[in-house]
């Protein structure tokens, strides 16, 4: 149980370091969107899918990118991306296309100076290690990012 409490403390510590201003701006973007598209890859993709489900339960119009039932994007839509590195090629390509079509881009990441960080209109930096990072954390690879991003 001690290890479990240490992990919870680690998540709480990181959560307290996330910028309230960034979260407020992202919240306003979510509230103002006509439709919200969400995408992530790997474990970050699992977290973004869970977030999409929560937004749906809150009454927002949401779709997961790549699903057969996803509508076409239009101006006034929001594309939320979860990417620890901010460099996942498929997500970068999707973000560029969406941006070119007038879609607002929101990003949850550890790396605001990444390619996705440069493309995004709204960024929430989750100050954890990415899977490429050598920083020490109790949890392996990007686990802390994934848990905190949810």
Model-predicted segments: where are they?
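Generic secondary-structure signature for well-ordered alpha-helical cores
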Residues: 13-20, 60, 128-129
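Short, contiguous, pocket-lining structural segments
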Residues: 3, 22-25, 43, 55
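Glycine-rich phosphate-binding loops that contact phosphosugars or nucleotide phosphates
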Residues: 37-41, 46-149
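A short, well-structured juxtamembrane/interface segment
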Residues: 16-32
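Generic N-terminal amphipathic, Lys/Arg-enriched alpha-helix
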Residues: 1-16
């Amino acid at each position: 149980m001690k290890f479990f409490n240490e992990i919870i403390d680690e998540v709480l510590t990181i959560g307290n370091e996330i910028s309230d201003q960034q979260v407020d701006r992202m919240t306003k973007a979510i509230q103002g969107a006509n439709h919200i598209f969400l995408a992530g890859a790997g474990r970050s993709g699992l977290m973004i899918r869970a977030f999409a489900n929560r937004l749906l339960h809150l009454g927002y119009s949401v779709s997961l990118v790549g699903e057969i039932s996803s509508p076409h994007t239009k101006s006034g839509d929001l594309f939320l991306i979860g990417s620890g590195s901010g460099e996942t090629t498929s997500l970068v390509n999707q973000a560029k296309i969406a941006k070119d079509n007038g879609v607002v881009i929101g990003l949850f990441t550890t790396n605001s100076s990444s390619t996705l960080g440069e493309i995004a209109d709204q960024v929430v930096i989750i100050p954890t290690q990415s899977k490429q990072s050598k920083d020490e954390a109790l949890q392996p690879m990007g686990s802390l990012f994934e848990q905190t991003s949810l």
